[in-house]
Amino acid sequence: FPYQGSSIILESGNVNDYEVVYPRKVTALPKGAVQQKYEDAMQYEFKVNGEPVVLHLEKNKGLFSKDYSEIHYSPDGRRITTHPLVEDHCYYRGHIRNDADSTASISACNGLKGHFKLRGETYLIEPMKISNSEAHAVYKYENVEKEDEAHKMCGVTQNWESYEPIKKASQLIVSTEFQRYMEIVIVVDHSMYTKYKGDSDKIKAWVYEMINTISESYRYLYIDIIVSALEMWSEKDLINVETSAENTLKSFGEWRAKDLIHRISHDNAQLLTATDFDGPTIGLAYVASMCDPKRSVGVVQDHSSVNHLVAITLAHEIAHNLGVHHDEGSCSCGSGYTCIMSPVINSEVIKYFSDCSYIQCREYISKENPPCILNKPLRTDTVSTPVSGNELLEAGKDYD
C-alpha cells in the first residue's frame, strides 16, 4: 500500500496502515431522468495499491418494508411511532468492475463507508475526518488496532442444539421456490441508546449499515432480509436486560410475544444492547425457531467499533433461528476464509456462510417450512415498479 503517515483515528478505531483515495463519481443519468438524492445505480473510480478500480453500486431496494416504522418513547413513557419515507435511502450493494469474484456493501450517506472485496482481499473504506475534503481511507481490517484481543463467542452451546446428519450440497435441489422473505424488527435497548448519546440518526445509520451488510450474506441462502421497524428504548428498557445473555433472551422473547407482535407485522426480532454479557458471549439465539412468537428472537452485544463485526454477529444469531448450527471442522466457505457460523468471532472480516450452513438452512426450510417467511412483502419502491397482481400480497399476516 502506498500509505500516508502512520496512524489515523477513524470511526472504526485507530488504523495503522491506510491508503488515501479520492473517489470520483462517474455515473451519467439518462436524458430526462429525475435526479434523486441517491440514484438507483452509481459508479465511483479510485485507486487501490496504485491500480484504478471502478466500484459499481446498486441501491438495495428491498432493504425496508412498505410500512416501515420507527418507534421511540417520550419522557412520560408514551410510545411515538413514525413512518419515515425511506425510498430515497443511501444503502448500496455492488462489485468492482472486471473482477467476477468481487462484492461490495456500501452506505453512500456521507461519503462512502463500508467494505468491498477486490482480488480475494477484503478492504474497508470510510471518509476521513477532514472538512471540505473528498478524502477517504481504504484499509484492511487487520490494520485496525484491536480494542481487546479476548475471544468473543456465540453463547449457543451443544445442549441448545440437536445435530443431525447433513446431506451433501449436491443432494439438494435448489429452485426459486426456495426464496424466502424475512421481515425483521431491530430493538435498540437503553444502554445502546445511551452509548450513542441519544443520537437517533447515528443509531439508525449504524443499524441500517449492518442490515445492508447481512442482506448481502443472506442472498446466498436465498433469503431476503427486510427491515419492518426500528424500535429505540429511549427512556428506559422495557425488559430486564441482564449480563446473562440467556435470561435477556428469554425476557426479550416473552416481551415480543406479549407486546411487539401485536403492533408490528414481522417475522423475527433482534435486540441490540451495549450491555457486556457474561464471559466471552456476544450473542445468543434460539435454534430452529423462526415464526415462533417467543423464540424467533436473538440478542446481540454491540461489541465492536467496526460495524461489520457486529453485523456478522447479528447474521450469525438470525441463522440460528433458521436452524443453522455452528460450523465444525470440515465446513468451508472458500479457501482460507472464516465463515459466519464459526463459534468464535476472530479478528478478520467474515462475509460468507459455509456449505454446511447452506445445507442446514435449506433442510430446515424444506422440513419445517416456517410459514411467516413465505410471503413477499411490499417493497418501498412498489409504487413506481410495475408488478404482477399476484405479487401484491398483503403484508400484515404474521400471527393471526
UniProtKB/Swiss-Prot annotation:
One GO biological process term: proteolysis
Family designation: Belongs to the venom metalloproteinase (M12B) family. P-I subfamily.
Residue numbers binding Ca(2+) 2: 387, 390, 392, 394, 400
GO CC terms in record: extracellular region; plasma membrane
Record: active site: 317
Cofactors, names only: Zn(2+)
Domain of life: Eukaryota
Single GO molecular function: metal ion binding
Tissue specificity as recorded in UniProt: Expressed by the venom gland.
Enzyme Commission number, as recorded: 3.4.24.-
InterPro entries to which the protein is assigned, alphabetical: MetalloPept_cat_dom_sf, Peptidase_M12B, Peptidase_M12B_N, Reprolysin_adamalysin
Protein name, per record: Snake venom metalloproteinase H1
Domain Peptidase M12B residue range list: 180-377
Function in brief: Snake venom metalloproteinase that impairs hemostasis in the envenomed animal.
Cofactor note: Binds 1 zinc ion per subunit.
Assembly description: Monomer.
Keyword DNA-binding: no
Binding site for Zn(2+): 316, 320, 326
Source organism of this protein record: Deinagkistrodon acutus (Hundred-pace snake)
One matching Pfam family: Pep_M12B_propep
Residues bound to Ca(2+) 1: 183, 267, 372, 375
Secretion signal span: 1-6
Keywords: Calcium, Disulfide bond, Hemostasis impairing toxin, Hydrolase, Metal-binding, Metalloprotease, Protease, Secreted, Signal, Toxin, Zinc, Zymogen
Propeptide residue intervals: 7-176, 378-400
